[in-house]
């Protein structure tokens, strides 16, 4: 109830400013002290996946904490894992503001952020300083000015810099807000990417005597034929996991609703069915050889269960946290 009162005030503010305010609020020492006094500990519901032990199945999706500034405070919510980023080799501003739009009537969010971040070196320093002992995924992308033909170099730079500090690495090739990025999901570009990141993973494994799983984050706008092809390639190159899915460019589910004409990726409840359909196709074609992290439209315990039933091994939340607050996460953890 308390969060919904705060949400009314937050929704009067520009979404990007509100986002920053909430993170700063969670990071304040007073709030952290009150949490220790009034919030009961979350029971451990450990699960093994990708060779890692997660405290529970519920993770925070990338995008909430792009630069790793708030890892410790977000971990107090109870997440079994936290994914930071998307981060690029060099800092970049992203797309012009405004670039986030709420669609409250259907619990949706449209964003066209464009990988705004402070660069890989800044994030690495924050991960090194973090006191969180759980699973930290680091989501990486290419810089806007990097040509698509040279994109692999950006991913390899990031892998080399974060490998020692990451629990797993997420390769973001599916954001709709960086020009041509989604081309990396197709043809020879996709195969070259998978081949080169596995080669780099092997090099880093030898260097640090530490195996860090690599997962690929894909689009919900792929056809069944394309998903089958991707599944086959993920198996062939022995990729460690797949995140399904990123945001969608399909806004047909929100006709005649405020902000529906804004360009960008749509997430939240309108993404739920698309994401579930993708997970189901992946599950059938991956044949349990590669784990699936399901994300998109989780706003209740039932929708969390649906993701698992479709074939997800782990799930992630973003929009659900914005619309329903931290208690929503704890309820899912307790009941899933």
From Swiss-Prot:
InterPro entries: Aldolase_TIM, DHO_dehydrogenase, Dihydroorotate_DH_1_2, Dihydroorotate_DH_2, Dihydroorotate_DH_cat, Dihydroorotate_DH_CS. Pathway: Pyrimidine metabolism; UMP biosynthesis via de novo pathway; orotate from (S)-dihydroorotate (quinone route): step 1/1. FMN binds at residues 62-66, 86, 139, 172, 217, 245, 268, 297, 318-319. GO terms for molecular function: dihydroorotate dehydrogenase (quinone) activity. Its EC number is 1.3.5.2. Its cofactor is FMN. The keyword Electron transport does not apply. CDD domains: DHOD_2_like. One of its GO terms (biological process) is 'de novo' UMP biosynthetic process. It is found in: Cell membrane. It catalyses: (S)-dihydroorotate + a quinone = orotate + a quinol. Its main location: membrane. GO terms for cellular component: cytoplasm; plasma membrane. HAMAP family: DHO_dh_type2. This is Dihydroorotate dehydrogenase (quinone). It comes from Buchnera aphidicola subsp. Schizaphis graminum (strain Sg).
């Amino acid at each position: 109830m308390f969060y919904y009162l705060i949400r009314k005030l937050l929704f009067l503010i520009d979404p990007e400013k509100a986002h920053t305010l909430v993170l700063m609020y969670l990071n304040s020492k007073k709030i952290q002290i009150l949490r220790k006094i009034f919030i009961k500990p979350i029971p451990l519901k450990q699960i093994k996946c990708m060779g890692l032990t997660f405290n529970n199945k519920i993770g925070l999706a990338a995008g909430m904490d792009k630069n790793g500034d708030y890892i410790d405070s977000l971990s107090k919510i109870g997440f079994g894992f936290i994914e930071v980023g998307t981060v690029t080799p060099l800092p970049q501003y992203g797309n012009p503001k405004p670039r986030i739009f709420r669609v409250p009537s259907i619990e949706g969010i449209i964003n066209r952020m464009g990988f705004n971040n402070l660069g890989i070196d800044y994030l690495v320093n924050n991960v090194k300083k973090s006191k969180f002992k759980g699973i930290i995924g680091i989501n990486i992308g290419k810089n806007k000015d990097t040509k698509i033909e040279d994109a692999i170099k950006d991913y390899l730079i990031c892998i080399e810099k974060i490998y020692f500090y990451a629990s797993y690495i997420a390769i973001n090739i599916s954001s709709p807000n960086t020009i041509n990025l989604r081309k990396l999901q197709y043809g020879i570009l996709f195969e070259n990417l998978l081949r080169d990141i596995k080669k780099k993973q092997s090099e880093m494994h030898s260097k640090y005597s530490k195996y860090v799983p690599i997962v690929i984050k894909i689009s919900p706008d792929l056809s069944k034929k394309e998903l089958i092809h991707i599944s086959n390639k993920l198996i062939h190159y022995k990729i460690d996991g797949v995140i399904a899915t990123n945001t969608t460019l399909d806004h047909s589910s929100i006709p005649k609703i405020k902000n529906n004409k804004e360009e960008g990726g749509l997430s939240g409840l309108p993404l739920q069915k698309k994401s579930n359909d993708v997970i189901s196709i992946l599950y059938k074609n991956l044949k349990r050889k590669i784990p699936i992290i399901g994300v998109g439209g989780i706003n209740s315990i039932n929708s969390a269960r649906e993701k698992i039933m479709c074939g997800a091994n782990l799930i992630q939340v973003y929009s659900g946290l914005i619309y329903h607050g931290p208690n929503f996460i704890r309820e899912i953890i307790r009941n899933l």
